[in-house]
Amino acid sequence: NPRGLPAFKHGNXVLNESYAXMYLESQFGSXGXLIPDADVIYYNWKVPEGERHD
């Protein structure tokens, strides 16, 4: 890691942290999902603040 970027290490594979979630999900997919696929994760970006429900 010459540039000092955050890294994730699993066995002999060293990954950038931005790819770690996708890597873990592909390796351990039977244990569940790490990346949500529902539209609720975009709620704060898609719904104007005045129209949001608490």
Curated annotation (Swiss-Prot):
Q: GO: which molecular function terms?
A: glutathione transferase activity
Give me the Gene Ontology terms describing cellular component.
cytoplasm
Compartments in which it is found: Cytoplasm
EC number in record: 2.5.1.18
Q: How does it assemble?
A: Homodimer.
Task of the protein: Conjugation of reduced glutathione to a wide number of exogenous and endogenous hydrophobic electrophiles.
What post-translational events are described? Answer: The N-terminus is blocked.
Instruction: Report what the protein is called.
Output: Glutathione S-transferase 6.7
Where are the coiled-coil regions?
none
Asked if Lipoprotein is a keyword of the record, the answer is: no
On whether Cytoplasm is a keyword of this UniProt record, the answer is yes
Keywords of the record: Cytoplasm, Transferase
Q: What is its main location?
A: cytoplasm
Q: Which family does it belong to?
A: Belongs to the GST superfamily. Theta family.
UniProt organism field: Dicentrarchus labrax (European seabass)
What's the catalysed reaction?
Answer: RX + glutathione = an S-substituted glutathione + a halide anion + H(+)
Q: What class of enzyme is it?
A: transferase
